[in-house]
Each structure stands twice: as C-alpha cells, then as structure tokens.
C-alpha cells in the first residue's frame, strides 16, 4: 500500500463511522454505551461497522460488561453472512467506578441477554494467555480464521497477537484500546510501545485513532509461528 492508498483507507474509515450518525444504530449504541461501556461512542460505532463488514470470525479479548461485545454482536446480526463472535473474559469485580460491578461475568451475560445477542456470542472464561483458554478459542474457531481482533484487556497486546496471530486472516482488522489516554492510566505506555513496535516491524498498518485513545489498523499478513 502506497502513501496515497494509505491516506484513502484512513479517510474511508472515518467517513464510514461518521455516516452512521444518521442511522438508528447510532442512537442505540449511544444509549447502551452510556450505561455499559468505557470506550467512546465512535469506538462502539467502529466496532459495529467492522464486525458487519469484516471477513471471518471476530475475537474479543477483554469484554468487561459487554459494551463492545454487544456492538460487535449487532454488527454480526446485520452482516450478510454468518460469523462467529468469541469473547474472552476472566471475570472478577470492579469497585469505585461508574461501571462498578461485583461480578463482571454476570453483568456481561445479563447485558448480552437483555440485548438479545446471547446466542451470537461464545464466552470463554479465563485469561487470554492461559493454555486452556487458547485451546478453547481454537476449538470454537475450528477451521475459521479471525477477521476482527479487539484487544481491551491488560497492556500486553503483543503477547495476545503472538498467541492468536496464526488465526488472523491477511488484512484482519484490529481495534486496540488504551493506545492513548490519561497520563495516570498505567496501560497506555506499554500498549503504545508495543503497538508502535509492531507497526515499525511491518506487522500492523495504522488506520486511525478514535475516541479517548483507541488504535485501529490492519494485520499485514505475516504469519507468526503458533505459540504452544
């Protein structure tokens, strides 16, 4: 991709996200996001859009209460072809926050049920790097490959890309949260460092920066050896 094509790809993506402001889905995402999501509305719209248009399955690492999970599920619902949506979430609790919950997994499952997307989502409980979780994801995907990877867990996005990279299709979309943001967010510095290293190595192509600090881009199609 030359510079002009790269610029056009960035512009087309921004234009696509902006166009949803005139669609009913924008209001639905806005209403749901205010109650259940930490990410910016534009990121929810972006997630919906990419889930709707991508080739292949969708893998989300770090669902929390299901803000982006529901956005992706609605995108899958409105897509022309059937797609798998797999989300990894270890659970636990979060206190002293506007989205505080005593039981993250319970809140996630409740939100999926309330929005009518439970049957569209496969939840894998655990941490993305645990061998049994990696194995469960591969079983759920079977022969399918991933066309959209959403990373919003801890700050080690490179570790997750190393583990799941062999399942990414050439040109797979990536949404990586905490690339930027407030100075007191401990996830920002390591996330930005790792993403920039992957961009400089040619593995990732940057296509934008959305919301409060979410990076979006594409996988460059270099197959990594499978991590066992």
Residue map of PLM features:
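S-adenosylmethionine/decaboxylated-SAM
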Residues: 22, 26-33, 45-228
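Rossmann-like AdoMet
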Residues: 1-37
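N-terminal pre-P-loop "Q-motif" helix
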Residues: 38-43
